[in-house]
Amino acid sequence: ECMKFLSKNIRYPKTAWKNKVQGRVIVQFWVETDGSISDVKVVKGVSWDLNDEAIRVVKSMPNFKPGTVGGEPARIQFNLPIIFRLQ
């Protein structure tokens, strides 16, 4: 579901396309106890434009099902790789 959302919503930045920039951006974020996403940041970037697009698309994702610890909702950290590849 997450990958389907990303593939439909990522827009390859024009400057990156023009300069033939591609690579993998790793975005770190937290899923809160209510399923919302917070504290989105790039932990491994490629270029400012690909990094910005990765952050934008992660922030636009719908709420997740919250994680649980011992049956209780818990705040969970994720690292999500987003691959930008020119076709």
Language-model features: where?
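Short proline/glycine- and basic residue-enriched helix-capping loop/turn segments at helix->loop/beta transitions
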Residues: 1-27, 53-87
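Residue-level recognition of the GNAT/N-acetyltransferase active site
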Residues: 13, 32, 43
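Short loop/turn motifs enriched for small/polar and acidic residues
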Residues: 30, 45, 79
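Short, acidic, Ser/Thr-enriched surface-loop or helix-capping motifs
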Residues: 31-32, 37, 68
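Short coil/turn motifs at secondary-structure junctions
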Residues: 34, 45, 83-87
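A short acidic/small-residue loop/turn micro-motif
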Residues: 43-50
